Design a protein with these regions (language model features):
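Structural microenvironment flanking redox-active thiols in thiol-disulfide oxidoreductases
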Residues: 80-111, 116-143
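Solvent-exposed, acidic/flexible segments
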Residues: 51-52, 66-70, 95-102, 111-115, ...
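Short N-terminal micro-motifs specific to bacterial/archaeal maturation
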Residues: 20, 46-49, 109, 130, ...
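Extracytoplasmic thiol/disulfide redox context detector
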Residues: 2-5, 10-96, 170, 174, ...
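Extracytoplasmic/secreted envelope proteins and their assembly/folding machinery
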Residues: 71-78, 82, 102-106, 119, ...
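C-terminal cap of thioredoxin/glutaredoxin-like
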Residues: 3-5, 30, 60, 144-215
Length: 215
């Protein structure tokens, strides 16, 4: 099982490191200096767009730390950066013995324009309501909750498309060597395992500050 830790614990570790060392790490991306604790993946292409930062969260619906980060940590970042931050989740299973139903539901909802809503509903159902989502009746409740038609949703779910999208995301995570969830990828090639909001804010601010020198 991949190791995981909550962002609150990471925050304490991050602040201690910053106090001792000034900045945990710096790197050059183009001409812009990035600050914080991160790894630039040289084999991956940057997807950066001026004035925007793309945040990809590799997460397991059954991971409690992923649930906490998605509900608390991500909210802090969205409040800090507003429409300058584009966040999306990629399903990456690390908890053994779980069927891929939750991930397939998320992928199908994305194709119908309700990915973020379904993500929140699935996380809540698993971690707060403590209800499994294998049963079709439970799925129908969630599908209606996010404003989708159950018949159309189930038809799409039965096709190969959601499963393929989930598998493509898993392969992406394997390629960039995800070791724990949640792990964040910024702008396609900046990998962040220390996912406390303070470290992520430091990195994202430095990306945005460097836009004037980016080619």
């Amino acid at each position: 099982m991949a190791k995981r830790r909550g962002w609150r614990g990471s925050l304490l570790m991050g602040l201690m490191a910053v106090a001792a060392l000034g900045f945990v790490g710096t790197a050059q991306a183009g001409k812009a200096e990035l600050k914080g604790n991160f790894q630039v993946l040289s084999d991956e292409k940057s997807t950066h767009k001026p004035g925007k930062v793309q945040l990809t969260e590799f997460a397991d619906f059954y991971c409690p730390h992923c649930h906490r980060f998605d509900g608390e940590g991500l909210a802090i970042l969205e409040k800090e950066f507003g429409n300058k931050l584009e966040a999306v989740m990629v399903g990456y299973p690390v908890i053994p013995g779980k069927l891929p139903t939750a991930f397939d539901m998320y992928e199908q909802a994305k194709t119908m324009g309700k990915g973020a809503e379904m993500k929140r509903a699935v996380f809540r159902t698993i971690h707060k309501d403590k209800i499994g989502i294998i049963d079709k009746a439970i799925r129908e409740v969630l599908i209606r909750e996010v404003g989708l038609d159950p018949a159309a949703f189930e038809e799409g779910l039965a096709s190969a498309k959601p499963a393929k999208a989930f598998e493509d995301g898993r392969k992406w995570g394997d390629r960039i060597k995800i070791q724990q969830t949640p792990t964040v990828l910024l702008d396609g090639n900046i990998k962040v395992e220390q996912i406390d909001p303070e470290n992520l804010k430091l990195i994202i601010h430095s990306i945005l500050d460097g836009d004037g020198t980016r080619k």
